[in-house]
Amino acid sequence: MLKKIFYFPIKIFVKSNILKKEKLTERFNEIYKKNYWGDFQSVSGPGSSLKNSKNIRIALKKIIKEYKISSITDAPCGDCNWIKNIFKNNKIKYLGVDIVAELIEKNKIEYKSKKNFNFKFLDLTKNKIPSADLIICRDLLFHLSFKDGKKFLRNLFQSKYKYLLMTSHSNGIHNNFNNVKDIESGDFRKINIFKKPYNFNKNYELLIKDFCDGKEKYMILFKSK
């Protein structure tokens, strides 16, 4: 009972201090160090647990085979907990990028035996995203303000890719809500990528249920124009 009484005030206090930091690198570094999103399996949050990533892991294996994917950029990669064991084929080149430099260095050590794995520090709101057959942007946009989200999308669309996997809390038909709530980057709110300010085309290749703890969320596969 004491944990329940004190946990939420502490959590709110920590978040308030994190979001006051001016630079995104500082905010996300603090989130990582304090394990603010973490659960028992992953510092990247509950969406990266094996339980909550089951559907996307199954789907990603099929996507790699069906769409003949030979290279992947995972932006952001976090600690790679959900994706680390998908690539049995070492011919698939995997690049994980993230804004937390300490986590990138840790990943380089953790996955050094995987010769097809590489990692790079990037602020996705400032840097062009490395090109690949498939770019995965899982659980990112809903942590970015509208302003930073637009910066990220500008960089994303400057990259070359054949396919893009993107998170949305709406499939464009069911629960087709408008994006009205803005946040400070590092916080969270639900997003619908088919509505302003994102305006993704509803003509997508594949819809994958990527529910987190039973809450509606999707990964949506788009083909490059």
PLM regions with names:
Residues 140:
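Hydrophobic adenine-recognition pocket in adenosine-nucleotide-binding enzymes
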Residues 136:
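A conserved beta-strand element that flanks and buttresses the S-adenosyl-L-methionine
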Residues 2-130, 144-225:
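Class I (Rossmann-like) S-adenosyl-L-methionine-dependent methyltransferase catalytic domain
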